[in-house]
């Protein structure tokens, strides 16, 4: 029986790989719109990757520009080409999984920023993840535990809990994981990383009250995937628990990581938002286009 189950799952994954490989990559890249020092700029690069402008600082969160995620072909082009990013002050990585911590992208960011302005950015990672990024060229590595704060110039960064796991391979379960809330004097933004729905959304909202929430909506089928990922409806409930003004969905439409129809997450999110009466607060961003919050 076990062998039958293994063969069935291997066959399903093989179909996922073949479908990814045979699907034509779509989308286009754009130059990011630049925000003023008093504005919050949010640019969706794809998957869980964002270029963020806040408090006059430039950040990348979970940057991944890979054409292939090991055997899975990227289905949509990055919304911003790596070489078109301005010099970055900070890079935040939510956890060590390959779709969130992409070493070649991180190495290129450190190199390009150092070339443009003479100094590589600081990289912020969860506890026990620093060794993975230690030789990528960053000027400083900051490791954080949940609820720990790090101040950089005019920003405060808080590492927040999530319901996921942090191992990059099979035995390194000591690695941390979570999300981040980044706050300036005027704006705040929350990136959840990967997470299932959990009571922590309410606690994050109570403690930090983020203005904008970047929440994952894909990789929820089969049902047991929801032990570590949010469905669209779960993500919307997390948004309501947080009490944020706006939600921006992520973790969908870039890599085929699970077995729901590829276009289903966004459709279900829009239906759930309409039912809850918050459609005007759920902003699905096109890759490469910048949303400016005044």
Mark where each language-model region is:
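Pre-active-site segment of Zn-dependent metallo-hydrolases
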Residues: 26-34, 54-96, 100-114, 167-171, ...
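Active-site metal-binding loops of divalent metal-dependent hydrolases
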Residues: 63-66, 95-96, 128-129, 160-164, ...
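Divalent metal-coordination and catalytic microenvironments
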Residues: 52, 62, 95, 102, ...
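Cap/insert and terminal regions of metallo-dependent hydrolase folds
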Residues: 90, 121-124, 128-131, 198-286
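Active-site-proximal beta-strand elements of phosphoester/diester hydrolases
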Residues: 41-44, 58-62, 156-162, 188-194
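Zn-dependent metallo-beta-lactamase
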Residues: 1-60, 65-69, 287
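Short gly/ser/thr-rich secondary-structure transition/capping motifs
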Residues: 41-44, 70-78, 193-195, 229
């Amino acid at each position: 029986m076990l062998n039958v189950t293994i063969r069935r799952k291997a066959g399903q994954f093989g179909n996922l790989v073949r479908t990814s490989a045979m699907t034509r990559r779509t989308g286009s890249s754009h130059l990011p719109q630049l925000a003023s020092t008093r504005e919050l700029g949010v640019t969706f690069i794809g998957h869980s990757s964002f270029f963020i402008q806040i408090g006059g600082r430039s950040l990348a969160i979970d940057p991944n520009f890979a054409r292939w995620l090991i055997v899975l072909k990227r289905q949509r082009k990055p919304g911003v080409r790596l070489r078109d990013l301005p010099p970055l002050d900070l890079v935040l990585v939510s956890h060590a999984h390959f779709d969130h911590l992409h070493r070649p992208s991180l190495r290129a960011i450190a190199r390009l920023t150092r070339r443009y302005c003479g100094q590589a950015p600081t990289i912020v990672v969860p506890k026990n993840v620093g060794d993975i990024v230690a030789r990528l060229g960053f000027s400083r590595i900051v490791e954080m535990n949940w609820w720990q704060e790090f101040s950089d110039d005019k920003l405060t960064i808080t590492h927040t809990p999530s319901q996921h796991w942090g191992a990059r391979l099979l035995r390194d379960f000591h690695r941390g994981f979570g999300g981040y809330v980044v706050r300036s004097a005027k704006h705040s933004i929350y990136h959840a990383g990967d997470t299932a729905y959990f009571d922590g959304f309410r606690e994050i909202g109570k403690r930090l009250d983020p203005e904008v929430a970047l929440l994952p909506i894909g990789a929820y089928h089969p049902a047991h995937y929801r032990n570590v990922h949010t469905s669209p409806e779960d993500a919307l409930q997390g948004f309501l628990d947080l009490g944020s003004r706006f939600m921006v969905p992520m973790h969908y439409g870039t890599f085929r990581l699970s077995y729901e129809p590829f276009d289903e997450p966004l459709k279900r999110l829009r239906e759930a938002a309409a039912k809850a009466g918050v459609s005007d607060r759920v902003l699905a961003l096109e890759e490469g286009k910048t949303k400016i919050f005044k």
